[in-house]
Amino acid sequence: MDEQAKQLVSEVVRPLPPEPGHPLRIDYEYVREGQCTVWMFVEPLAGWRSVRTSDRRTGVDWAHQVQQLVNDRRYAGAERITLVCDNLNTHQLGSLYQAFEPAEALRLARRIELVHPPKHGSWLNAAEPELSALTRQCLGQRIATRKEVGQLARIWKNCRNRRRVHIDWQFTTDNARIKLRHLYPKMLD
């Protein structure tokens, strides 16, 4: 899972539609309308992702996103759900206890296993390339409201899930030993 902030921006002057020989013309002036957070959960090999939005990006917001994931019928039969998360201070089991009553927090904590990539290893989180694709294909334009961001992200997600676009992770242990050799300890003879 991963999340990113999305700046909300509205137009001051309505863009001029494209005409033959002229692309869409957008005025450089805009109005900041705040920001929202886009949350991405990915199951890479299954070609499934979930995208949601919230107003903020706090530990309590993260806990509510995790609760929705755990309560999803997709994971009803799963004993444990492994979540690869960034090393943010909000991505901790303690956030569940800030957001919920102890019994609910314990129920959620027992269902998830948090895995944090090594420092400077966020590229190991499969949700990052999905967020990048979402931004490039869908959210890289001026969007004024969180509702619009949610609608566009939902359409994108449904299309990707319907096509079962999976992440073909081809980084083997042998490749890691070559490409990441600078991270391995040096043995003296």
Task: Describe each PLM feature range.
Residues D2, F41, G47, V66, ...:
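Mobile genetic element proteins and their domesticated derivatives, centered on retroelements
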